[in-house]
Curated annotation (Swiss-Prot):
Role description: Probable heme-thiolate monooxygenase.
Essential cofactor(s): heme
4Fe-4S found in the keyword field: no
GO molecular function: heme binding; iron ion binding; monooxygenase activity; oxidoreductase activity, acting on paired donors, with incorporation or reduction of molecular oxygen
Disulfide bridges in this chain: none
Database matches in Gene3D superfamilies: Cytochrome P450
Name the UniProt record assigns to this protein: Cytochrome P450 CYP82H23
Keyword annotations from UniProtKB, A to Z: Heme, Iron, Metal-binding, Monooxygenase, Oxidoreductase
Induction / repression: Down-regulated by methyl jasmonate (MeJA).
InterPro entries in alphabetical order: Cyt_P450, Cyt_P450_E_grp-I, Cyt_P450_sf, Plant_Cytochrome_P450_Monoox
One GO BP: terpene biosynthetic process
EC number: 1.14.-.-
SUPFAM superfamilies: Cytochrome P450 (SSF48264)
Length: 245
């Protein structure tokens, strides 16, 4: 279609007019030069059921709440200073990863003995532990002691990422939302949201209790602690504070 209609053209997908870009120069204009024009996203079934009715940054429309949330993300999670403070997390997790590999080698007799190792799964544990420690101060160890809660959360997170990218009939034609329900996607989204909400809710409660009873040094100050500190007693958002975090 790009060969026929050029590097930029529009399609009508249900109730939404969609622009298709196939040129890096045009893409730069859209997402760099005029990025604010393209920030607003249409409401979606995934945003409704898995994004706390479009309160999560991924599903937000551009506006004051989007700007405030983005500023907090950059300062509390993605700033050079924050990444430097939490450098020890990445180092310790890589060390643990290598140590577990070495211990498995020793348990197999060492020397010239060989063993098949599922590296994809192990790298998944490594990535998950780094992210969870930086965000929530949690560590779900790999291999056999990887907890049931960790597996449930990892599965729910994988389901969320899978469901978010699927095309839903109701996103294009809301009147036909019943089709998504018949296909089972609506129920899957609700169940996935409950699984994630259960875990995140417990983390928030634990962090709140820890802040009330203990002093927290900077190296232990994860993303949830930072967000709670900013939001406690502030008028940052009209949304529920826990949902915003």
């Amino acid at each position: 279609m790009a060969d026929k209609y050029g590097p930029i053209f529009s399609l009508q997908l249900g109730i939404h007019k969609t622009i298709v870009v196939s040129s890096w120069a045009v893409a730069k204009e859209c997402f760099t030069t005029h990025d604010k024009v393209f920030l607003t996203r249409p409401k979606s079934l995934a945003g409704k059921h898995m994004g706390y009715d479009h309160s999560v940054f991924l599903f937000l429309a551009y506006g004051p709440y989007w700007r405030d949330t983005r500023k907090l993300l950059i300062v509390e999670l993605l700033s050079n200073r924050r990444l430097d403070v939490l450098k020890h997390v990445r180092e310790s997790e890589v060390n643990s990863f290598v140590r577990e590999m070495y211990e498995q080698w020793i348990s197999n007799g060492g020397g010239g003995s060989k063993a098949v190792v599922e590296m994809k799964e192990r790298f998944g544990y490594l990535t998950m532990n780094v992210i969870l420690r930086m965000v929530a101060g949690k560590r779900y160890s790999g291999t056999e002691v990887y907890s049931d809660e960790a597996r449930r959360f990892q599965k729910a997170l994988g389901d969320l990422l899978h469901l978010v990218v699927l095309s839903m009939v109701s996103d294009a034609v809301p009147l036909f939302g019943w089709i998504d329900a018949l296909r089972g996607y609506t129920g899957e989204m609700k169940n996935t949201a409950k699984e994630i909400d259960h875990v995140l809710g417990r983390w928030l409660k634990e962090h709140r209790q820890k802040r009330e009873t203990l002093s927290i040094n900077e190296s232990e100050h994860d993303f949830i602690h930072g967000m709670q500190s900013v939001m406690d007693g502030s008028q940052f958002t009209e949304h529920d504070t826990d949902k915003a975090i």
